[in-house]
Design a protein with these regions (language model features):
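...with weaker cross-activation on analogous glycine-rich loops/strands in unrelated enzymes
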Residues: 86-162
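Active-site or metal-binding loop neighborhoods of secreted/extracellular toxin and effector enzymes
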Residues: 1-18, 135-181
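Generic detector of leucine side chains in alpha-helical contexts
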Residues: 22, 26, 50, 64-66, ...
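N-terminal capping segments
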Residues: 2-89
Length: 181
């Protein structure tokens, strides 16, 4: 899971381990193409209770899906992780908001390896062909979310992709991508 980087300064050398989860482990633990109500029910616990109380307010489950993949795929979310978290029936913490998932990923993996800024609803998916990793779409114009987080397998997203929008006034302003082996 780790990659070593060797840094040298003033005659001193040190190796820094950069740890990233394996894509195959995240994908194996990601609820691929599972509808949001089913995601909440499967995860249970506090997450499902909140969904049952307010299905409209908790209609988006993308951060919950990615939280599961991270929790079981080698980059667990800790109780001390900043952000709005809830517990699933497995007693693990899950992030529910895209904004907080972006912070979590950046804090653990650094800035995105690739940042794309589509113009005029341009489909930039070809620039990620044959790459695998975590993908985040920052979206303008949605009333209930600031974006979408998911996994990209080189051809498609684990649930939904938002490279192009067919809804008036909705655009993807930025695509952030972290490459995983």
């Amino acid at each position: 899971m780790g990659t070593g980087i060797r840094a040298t300064s003033s005659g001193q050398a040190s190796t820094i381990q950069v740890n990233r989860p394996l894509f195959s482990e995240l994908w194996k633990n990601y609820p691929v193409k599972m509808a949001a109500p089913d995601v909440y029910q499967t995860f249970g616990g506090q997450a499902f209770a909140l969904y049952q109380e307010n299905p409209t307010g908790y209609a988006n489950a993308c951060a919950l899906r990615l939280s599961k993949a991270l929790n079981y795929g080698g980059m667990p979310i800790k109780q001390t992780t900043k952000g709005y978290k809830v517990k699933g029936k497995d007693n693990k913490p899950y992030l529910l908001r895209v904004k907080e998932m972006i912070s979590f990923v950046e804090n653990n993996l650094g800035k995105a390896d690739i940042t794309l800024r589509p113009k005029n609803n341009e489909d930039v998916s070809s620039q990620l062909s044959n790459k695998k990793g975590i993908i985040i779409f920052k979206v303008s114009g949605w009333g209930d979310a600031t974006g979408h987080v998911t996994l990209w397998n080189g051809n498609d997203c684990g649930d939904s992709c938002y490279f192009v929008h067919h809804q008036q006034g909705v655009t993807t302003t930025e695509v952030l991508f972290w490459n995983l082996k």
